[in-house]
Amino acid sequence: IRPSRGLGDVYKRQFIGSHPEWEIKIEPDATFLSRTFKFTNFVQAADFAAQVGDIAEQANHHPRITLEFGKTRVDWWSHKIGNIHALDLKLAADTDQLI
């Protein structure tokens, strides 16, 4: 799937309705899906970040990953359009499957 334009609000709300752990966040340069995953230690958080990286590489579509002690935050959006694309919804759902 090639990013072309952002999804409408209806699709975003439907996704959040079925994936309530995810949030839609808005920054000046982007609208994105965000979720923070919690772990008991840094090693688990880092391992999870690496697994998300594997998904990203397979799709050639890369999120922002923020790694802290016991937490990994994943933000999906299409940089080219500065918004959420259908591929971001799929990859966010794929990210959930890692847990």
Regions found by a protein language model. Name each.
Residues 12-30:
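Short aromatic-glycine-(Arg/Gly/Cys) micro-motifs in beta-strand/loop hairpins
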Residues 43-47, 83-85:
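Short, conserved charged micro-motifs
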Residues 48-52, 89-92:
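Short amphipathic alpha-helices in soluble, non-transmembrane regions
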